């Protein structure tokens, strides 16, 4: 047995290790919340949690701060009062008591140095080490990327620039900040690595600096950034000719290298690549779960397995989600908290590209396709309508997919033609095999005979699956279970429904797009950074909330929240 397997932690040991990190994150989150004046239930408002985590990631981004300090030096020549260390965070706060509670938006000022000081007091002084802050903030960045994938389909634009927009289901983690991308490599889709590899190939051709830099590779060696990217692609690619293609890219000429990467990406729509899936929640949700579970909290610090679903449900009972005026489609429309709860659930579990009918079969409430949702961008808006605890819960669970979906021996530009599985549940193939074959047939013949042989083998694999699509199943032998079925005694068979694609166009629903004319951009307060798009005075209020039942009447133990008066 290898040393790696011998050193593998048991589930109890892993949860205990997770709890140490999660508790440190929670304590840092509470301290920063207090620093910007958040107390009690305000810490459990989802939009506040997202804003605080974004501020932390930016404050820990050295390159961003270097650029900002450079701009600050230029600004100070024109404005001696400019403070490069100051940042503003847009937050939701409440006023009043009892049944007369209102919520309003404010921008609170703090400083990067103060946030870094708080983080060091909880995590240690070496924040630049991946082991200290990298993984913590990497999972935070992964959640933010998952959120953007659902709201904006961020991966689609990247896929379109680098080949076909139909490849967007391979772009998990496309929105992760560059600093955390390689730390989180095993959680990132193969399409993102392929886009990076193409960028490096283009950069080499154009003579850009940095493409020949020396970076760390696996097994303690060093090499170029392209070699590092291709190592990641080879590891993720379906076994067989796709991996052989990946090994040839580094030494291939420009045209052959790009062509080989296109084949790997397009074939991966059906020959599904490997990706490690985990549940990742914002720190405000972990705080909510800890308040409920108390001494039992460590037993639920899981990123996979049944307890990951349970701790998510527990957190959902206590958090608050804001409804603002203004959605992606209509500036005058009020957001739906039910829709935002669905987006939150899908972002925590990375479900943007999972079979939507499978996700629908695992939760307590009906779900909507993306184009039916009334949601904004999960930032704090101008007019707060309501703040409520969501009702959505998981009723079933499944193991996360960590292996290949298939056994190794086996004109609608931009439309979704494939799924990327998150849960290891046996299901029929949903991929449009004919469209994959059309994409692969666009490959032009070049002189490199070994490449042509590999292309032929890839097409043969695709063709075999296409001919036997009705008989072949992904994740053969795996099932989902009721949430109380801890021992997997009663597997539940899954049959894909009418809507396997979350981004499927719904012809029966045609929302009216209403956008107000853009207001002239006011001069930005020079003491507020570009962390948020708008600047304002520290004590300004934006909008007035409707009267509603307060969060502390919706939750049972809110009096235990740190900072609660």
UniProtKB/Swiss-Prot annotation:
One of its GO terms (molecular function) is RNA binding. Signal peptide: none annotated. Residues 553-565 have a biased composition (Polar residues). The keyword tRNA processing does not apply. Residues 520-565 are annotated as: Disordered. Keywords: Capsid protein, Helical capsid protein, Host nucleus, Host-virus interaction, Ribonucleoprotein, RNA-binding, Viral nucleoprotein, Viral penetration into host nucleus, Virion, Virus entry into host cell. It is found in: Virion; Host nucleus. Disulfide bonds: none annotated. Late in virus-infected cells, may be cleaved from a 56-kDa protein to a 53-kDa protein by a cellular caspase. This cleavage might be a marker for the onset of apoptosis in infected cells or have a specific function in virus host interaction. GO terms for cellular component: helical viral capsid; host cell; host cell nucleus; ribonucleoprotein complex; viral nucleocapsid. Homomultimerizes to form the nucleocapsid. May bind host exportin-1/XPO1. Binds to viral genomic RNA. Protein-RNA contacts are mediated by a combination of electrostatic interactions between positively charged residues and the phosphate backbone and planar interactions between aromatic side chains and bases. Encapsidates the negative strand viral RNA, protecting it from nucleases. The encapsidated genomic RNA is termed the ribonucleoprotein (RNP) and serves as template for transcription and replication. The RNP needs to be localized in the host nucleus to start an infectious cycle, but is too large to diffuse through the nuclear pore complex. NP comprises at least 2 nuclear localization signals that are responsible for the active RNP import into the nucleus through cellular importin alpha/beta pathway. This is Nucleoprotein. It comes from Influenza C virus (strain C/Ann Arbor/1/1950). The gene is NP.
């Amino acid at each position: 047995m290898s040393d790696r397997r011998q050193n593998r932690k048991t589930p109890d040991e892993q949860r205990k290790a997770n709890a140490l990190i999660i508790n440190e994150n929670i304590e840092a989150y509470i301290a920063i919340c207090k620093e910007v004046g958040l107390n009690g239930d305000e810490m459990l408002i989802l939009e506040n949690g997202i804003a605080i985590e974004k501020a932390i990631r930016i404050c820990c981004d050295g390159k961003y701060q270097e650029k900002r300090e450079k701009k600050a030096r230029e600004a100070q020549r024109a404005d001696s009062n400019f403070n490069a260390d100051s940042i503003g965070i847009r937050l939701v706060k409440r006023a009043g008591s009892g049944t007369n509670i209102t919520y309003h938006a404010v921008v609170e000022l703090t400083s990067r140095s103060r946030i870094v000081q708080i983080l060091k007091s909880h995590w240690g002084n070496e924040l630049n080490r991946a082991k200290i802050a990298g993984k913590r903030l990497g999972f935070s960045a992964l959640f933010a990327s998952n959120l953007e994938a659902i709201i904006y389909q961020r991966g689609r634009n990247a896929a379109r620039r680098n080949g076909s927009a139909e490849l967007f289901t391979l772009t998990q983690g496309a929105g992760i900040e560059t600093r955390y991308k390689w730390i989180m490599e095993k959680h990132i889709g193969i399409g993102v690595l392929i886009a990076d590899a193409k960028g490096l190939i283009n950069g080499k051709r154009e003579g850009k600096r940095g493409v020949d830099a020396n970076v760390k590779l696996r097994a303690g060696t060093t090499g170029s950034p392209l070699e590092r990217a291709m190592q990641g692609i080879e590891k993720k690619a379906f076994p067989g000719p796709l991996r052989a293609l990946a090994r040839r890219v580094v030494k291939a000429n420009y045209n052959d290298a790009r062509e080989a990467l296109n084949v790997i990406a397009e074939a991966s729509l059906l020959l599904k690549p490997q990706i490690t899936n985990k549940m990742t929640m914002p720190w405000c949700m972990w705080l909510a779960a800890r308040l409920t579970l108390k001494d039992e909290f460590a037993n639920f610090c899981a990123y996979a397995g049944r307890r990951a679903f349970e701790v998510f449900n527990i957190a959902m009972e206590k958090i608050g989600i804001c409804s603002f005026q203004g959605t992606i489609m209509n500036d005058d429309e009020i957001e739906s908290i039910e829709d935002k709860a669905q987006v939150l659930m899908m972002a925590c579990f990375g479900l943007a590209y999972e079979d939507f009918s499978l996700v629908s079969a695992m939760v307590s409430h009906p779900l909507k396709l993306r184009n039916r949702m009334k949601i904004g961008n999960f930032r704090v808006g101008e007019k707060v309508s309501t703040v409520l605890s969501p009702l959505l819960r998981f009723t079933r669970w499944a193991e996360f997919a960590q292996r290949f979906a298939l056994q190794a021996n086996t004109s609608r530009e931009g439309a979704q033609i494939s799924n990327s599985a998150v849960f290891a549940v046996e299901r029929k193939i949903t991929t449009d095999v004919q469209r994959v074959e059309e994409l692969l047939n666009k490959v032009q013949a070049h002189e490199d005979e070994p490449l042509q042989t590999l292309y032929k083998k890839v097409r043969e694999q695709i063709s075999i699956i296409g001919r036997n699509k009705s008989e072949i199943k992904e994740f053969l032998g795996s099932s989902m279970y009721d949430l109380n079925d801890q021992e997997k005694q009663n597997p539940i068979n899954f049959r894909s429904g009418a809507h396997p694609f979350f981004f499927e166009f719904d012809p029966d629903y045609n929302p009216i797009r209403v956008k107000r004319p853009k207001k002239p951009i006011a001069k930005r307060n020079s003491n507020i950074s570009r962390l948020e798009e708008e600047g304002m005075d520290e004590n300004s209020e934006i909008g007035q909330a409707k009267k509603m039942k307060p969060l502390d009447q919706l939750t049972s133990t809110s009096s235990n929240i740190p900072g609660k008066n």
